[in-house]
């Protein structure tokens, strides 16, 4: 019997793709987060685009291209101990990601076409 749209373990293929893409996106967003901390340390405010972060040494890398990762964020002058949100996505779709002092968490319950997760302090447009 063939498995249609599912893996042998019964997990939907779409979930596998989301998980794989989340891993790629999260890895890059952790880099963004690290440089945001550096930028905040130097400037007492957060960068509002990747170009500002690229001005730091060592420079942050470009987002992955396979799959392509898009990152949009607005975090004006905030306390880094608080949470903020990032919209990021790949060819699977755009989702909200929540950045905290403990890392980047996927918010698969909140696609980028919807409202920001209520637990995030900032909404991005």
Predicted regions and their residues:
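Amphipathic alpha-helical segments typified by the pilin-like N-terminal helix
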Residues: 1-27, 34-35
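Periplasmic/extracellular, small/polar-rich flexible segments of pilin-like filament-forming proteins
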Residues: 34-125
């Amino acid at each position: 019997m063939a498995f249609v749209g599912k893996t042998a373990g019964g997990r939907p293929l779409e979930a596998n793709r989301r998980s794989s893409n989340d891993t790629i996106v999260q890895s890059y967003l952790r880099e963004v987060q690290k440089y945001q901390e550096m930028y905040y340390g130097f400037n007492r405010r957060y960068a509002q685009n990747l170009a500002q972060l690229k001005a730091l040494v060592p420079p942050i890398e470009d987002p992955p291209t396979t799959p392509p990762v898009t990152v949009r964020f607005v975090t004006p002058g905030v306390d880094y101990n608080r949470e903020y949100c990032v919209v990021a996505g790949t060819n699977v779709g755009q989702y909200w990601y929540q950045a905290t002092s403990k890392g980047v968490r996927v918010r698969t319950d909140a696609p980028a076409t919807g409202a920001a997760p209520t637990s995030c302090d900032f909404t991005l447009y």
